[in-house]
Swiss-Prot record:
Pfam families recorded: Neur_chan_LBD (PF02931), Neur_chan_memb (PF02932)
Subunit (UniProt): Forms a homooligomeric channel blocked by alpha-bungarotoxin. The structure is probably pentameric.
UniProt family annotation: Belongs to the ligand-gated ion channel (TC 1.A.9) family. Acetylcholine receptor (TC 1.A.9.1) subfamily.
UniProt GO MF annotations: excitatory extracellular ligand-gated monoatomic ion channel activity; transmembrane signaling receptor activity; transmitter-gated monoatomic ion channel activity involved in regulation of postsynaptic membrane potential
GO biological process assignments: chemical synaptic transmission; monoatomic ion transmembrane transport; regulation of membrane potential
Extracellular-side positions: 28-250
InterPro entries: Neur_chan_lig-bd, Neur_chan_lig-bd_sf, Neur_channel, Neuro-gated_channel_TM_sf, Neuro_actylchol_rec, Neurotrans-gated_channel_TM, Neurotransmitter_ion_chnl_CS
Protein name, per record: Acetylcholine receptor subunit alpha-type acr-7
Disulfide bonds: C160-C174, C229-C230
Record localization: Postsynaptic cell membrane; Cell membrane
Keyword Nuclease: no
Topological region Cytoplasmic: 334-513
Signal sequence segment: 1-27
């Protein structure tokens, strides 16, 4: 049963195979006959025009597929695009009815039919061995009415003059310039393929977006150029590429880290002036970080002196700010660690850094109030200093004779003085200069008084007077020792107070630098954001 079925199916299959093969051979014969008829006496070197004095019209359109690369450093753009050329060849017309309704045929390149020698004028060539024409040689489609449609694809590398002034918020406008290499405008009229009612432009219907650039538009324009040597026009077609850089990558990976690092330089002024190594180490590390980002930026931008990118100017400004902040930090530490033994606190320095600057910076100190151009100590916290009190030396020993009393005032009147003092910063924030002067005057007067009293007692010559002289000598020794201790304590207090004044001056300069550099930093950031004509984030 199986054998009988095979014997029936095989003849039927063989019959249909022979019939369809005959149709195919007949169709191929018609197409081959059409090729022979069209190419008989055809020369691909001759322009397809009946009148040699008339120009052949060639329309052109570009289909942008993708922007592959925008290399600002080498001033080059790489684009994947299709080119579409349409022209009419009167020698390639036929009646489809004579050739089994064949309406179109394909010709392989310029070796069979005439093709326009249109090239990309602004072609970018990296290697000397590269061909100037980089389009893929596809077949040209010829229709029965003589219309030729040729669509060669290619990856085009074109030179583009880029302006990186607003980098990374820049927009670039590049163009693809096409034109005939040998034909002038009277022989080949190159025109744009424009849809009626629309502006001439490249086709973006199949465009694939780029991760770094926005393709905003691709307008087209036809131009004619005349040269001094010739009267014929030379038409060209330009397809512009209006590109805008996507800024999120640069803002997130370059700008924001640099801003944060630079902002940390302001925090160095908030560190105590006693942290010598920490302040200098922090400022130096920040300076190196900004220089590192500046090195990364230099690798992104072209090596040109025509324009400096905005981001480069911003980084340079930040580098300058950090460098100056480091310098002023060193100045603050220099003021902080000055001593009375090697530096003199001049009146002008006092007036500027201990009076005016703290008042401007609205600084506060315990027991002191700052006013414009001066500083004084709060009187509620001061105590009246009494430099001397009334002293009387009365009778120490009383004899049996109650009429005999010795009063010190009979020997010598001791000086008495009362002084109320309001200390001023101009006389020293922490040094009781006036009190010290009055204490020294009081001590000198008291010494003279004791000497005069001793002299009077010696002249008296009584036993009681001799005892009193001995007591006065012992008291004089104690007074001299106490005076020596007082002077030593006063010297230590003086040194400490002057050192505290240097510390306070360093704090005032530190506060001043913090405010100034903060203002400069904010201004730089505002200018960086305000100058670009586009938004920071897309």
């Amino acid at each position: 049963m199986m054998v009988q079925s095979i014997q029936i199916v095989l003849p039927v299959a063989l019959f249909f195979l022979i019939v369809f093969n005959g149709f195919t051979v007949e169709g191929s014969k018609k197409e081959a006959q059409l090729y022979r008829d069209l190419l008989t006496n055809y020369s691909y070197l001759v322009r397809p025009v009946r009148n040699p004095k008339k120009a052949l019209t060639v329309t052109m359109k570009v289909f942008i597929q993708q922007v592959l690369l925008v290399d600002a450093k080498h001033q080059m753009i790489e684009v994947n695009a299709w080119l579409k050329y349409i022209w009419t060849d009167f020698r390639l017309r036929w009646n489809p009815l004579d050739y089994e309704n064949i309406t179109s045929v394909r010709f392989q390149g310029e070796d069979q039919i005439w093709q326009p020698d249109i090239l990309l004028y602004n072609r970018y060539i990296e290697d000397e061995q590269e061909s100037f024409d980089i389009t893929y040689k596809t077949n040209a489609v010829a229709y029965s009415d003589g219309v030729i449609n040729w669509i060669p694809p290619g990856i085009f590398k074109l030179s583009c003059k880029m302006d990186i002034t607003l980098f990374p918020f820049d927009e670039q406008i590049c163009f693809m310039k096409f034109g005939s290499w040998t034909y002038h405008g009277f022989a080949l009229d190159l025109r744009l393929d424009v849809v009626k009612g629309q502006e001439p432009s490249a086709d973006l219907s199949t465009y694939i977006t780029n991760g770094e650039w926005h393709l905003l538009s691709a307008p087209a324009r036809r131009e004619e150029k005349f040269y001094k040597c010739c009267k014929e026009p030379y038409p060209t077609v330009k397809f512009y590429l209006h590109l805008r850089r996507r800024t999120f990558y640069y803002v997130f990976n370059v700008v924001l880290p640099t801003l944060l690092v630079s902002f940390m330089s302001l925090l160095a002024f908030c560190l105590p002036a006693t942290d010598l190594s920490e302040k200098i180490g922090l400022q130096t590390t920040i300076l190196l970080s900004v220089c590192f980002f500046l090195t990364i930026l230099s690798e992104m931008t072209p090596t040109t002196s025509e324009a400096v990118p905005l981001l480069g100017v911003f980084f340079s400004a930040l580098t300058f700010i950090v460098a100056m902040s480091t310098t002023f930090t060193i100045l603050v530490l220099n003021i902080r660690y000055r001593q009375i033994t090697n530096h003199y606190l001049s009146p002008m320095f006092r007036s500027i850094f201990l009076e005016c600057l703290p008042w401007l910076m609205m600084m506060k100190r315990p027991d002191h109030k700052f006013r414009r151009g001066s500083s004084y100590r709060d009187s509620s916290a001061d105590q009246c200093v009494q430099c001397a009190k009334n002293a009387e030396l009365k009778s120490i020993l009383r004899g049996t004779d109650n009429q005999q009393q010795i009063e010190t005032n009979t020997f010598y009147p001791f000086p008495t003085e009362t002084l109320s003092l309001n200390r001023k910063v101009g006389d020293g924030l922490f040094i009781q200069r006036r009190c010290q002067i009055h204490e020294e005057a009081r001590s000198e007067k008291f010494t003279h008084g004791m000497l005069a009293c001793e002299k009077s007692l010696r002249e008296n010559g009584s036993e009681l007077a001799n005892i009193l002289v001995t007591i006065l000598k012992m008291y004089e020794v104690m007074v001299s020792q106490v005076e020596r201790i007082r002077k030593r304590i006063a010297l230590k207090r003086k040194r400490k107070d002057i050192q505290d004044e240097w510390k306070f001056a360093a704090q005032a300069v530190d506060r001043f630098c913090l405010i100034i550099f903060t203002i400069v930093f904010i201004i730089c950031c505002f200018i960086f954001v305000a100058i670009p004509p586009i938004k920071i984030l897309d």
